[in-house]
Amino acid sequence: MRSRLLPCLLLTLGSTAAGTAQEYSVATLADSLRQNAQAVVRLYETDFQYNSPSSATARHDIVVTLLDRRGARHADLVCYVDMFSSLKSFSAEICDASGRVIRKLGKGDLNYTEYSQHLADDAAYYWLEPPLSVFPCTVRYRYETAHKNGMFGTLRFVPLSTDIGVALEKARFRLSTPAGYAFNCRCTPFPVEPVRHTDRGRDNYEWTFPSR
């Protein structure tokens, strides 16, 4: 299990959840990913639909299995928002070792913190430290963000942190744009080429990152 090499996808733009809880039971986890791991990111998936510089949505599906109490921090969630983005929906499930759901959480369970009341960009973030009572266990997050009023800078997709003790099973990034829309992207530390197809006037790209 190696976690120092950080898979990262950067996309520069102009100004469906899959799987069931049972699929993420601890018994289905490969031994190679368990080795020296406190936690395993079972799935880290983002579907980003870009419509225009003032309209886009992103759907996120994150599944993390915590092998022992030391890995609990790897299930913490942070979602940043500002004047250009907002959190539309959120749900979470906590499952036992067999994948059985033992607790469900909603948007009302999130904490909300503003960086400063004096900032003009409305920068803030939602965060959650899930209430965990049994180990091993699995936490699944599904949430959607809306992007509006112009898009600036770079989209970052970072499915694996640099922390020692966490492994990655599967990661996918999907991007849908109007047909012919041009953008720049870069994958580090190793190149990953997307699968591309055009359907109903939109170009669709999918990057799949191998387990690490």
PLM segments and residue spans:
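Bacterial N-terminal signal peptides that target proteins for export
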Residues: 1-7
